[in-house]
Amino acid sequence: MSTSSALSSYYVDTIMGHEAEDVYGARYIQGSHTAPARPSGVVENADFSSCSFAPKSAVFPASWSSVHQPSTAAVSGIYHPYVHQTHLSDNRYVRSWIEPVANHISLTGFHPNSRHSGTKTESLPPKRTESAAFETETPSVPEFSLNAVSESADKATEERVGSDNSSHGEPKDEKQQQQLDPSNPAANWIHARSTRKKRCPYTKYQTLELEKEFLYNMYLTRDRRYEVARILNLTERQVKIWFQNRRMKMKKMNRERSSKDP
């Protein structure tokens, strides 16, 4: 029993601490140890003598109502508040949330020789004055003379006139060659003016042969149209259209003759 009481008191001493023994001692009530009452069913043995124990202080008070709330003064022996050490702040650790700002903005609260977790501070370029910035930013304007401008305008107009003349001269030469060439189908009398829709051109030889066929027969059969088209190097449709137009022309001439004659 004495061993268990000694262990319990040692356990309580380790929890409470040795620095505030006086404070904790005043809080608890000192009382004599009373032997627990034996149950009624247990019979005393006459062979063994009764044991007497020395009185000792109770571990816990008789009632829980006497326990008071701990104060800050009583706990000062266990809890030690953190005190900022000024001799370590300049050389070892710097607040990490200020490091990104310290690279670009100079803070007055830091020592100039303090390290920022191995980061290198970028040196800002020297500040330029307004006059120097204005001189560097102003673009250089090239100088032009009136003579140079007039010469360039004259050259541009000459080039335009020359290109227009060349473009108009080429079709004129082509038209003259077409009119002088007798074998050209566009130069014959069937070809209409440029203002009207151009008809299918026929050569003189083709027109003479078609006129001969028309004198023999005003209406050609299908087989004869294919034969004439093969001889004159034309299509069957061209021969058919020419005969239709020739018949319309002949009817018109007959109406004019009948109208003139009384």
Swiss-Prot record:
DNA-binding feature ranges: 195-254
UniProt biased composition (Basic and acidic residues): 152-176
Major place of residence: nucleus
Regions annotated as coiled coil: none
Protein function: Sequence-specific transcription factor which is part of a developmental regulatory system that provides cells with specific positional identities on the anterior-posterior axis.
Family: Belongs to the Abd-B homeobox family.
Protein's recorded name: Homeobox protein Hox-D9a
Gene name, Swiss-Prot/TrEMBL: hoxd9a
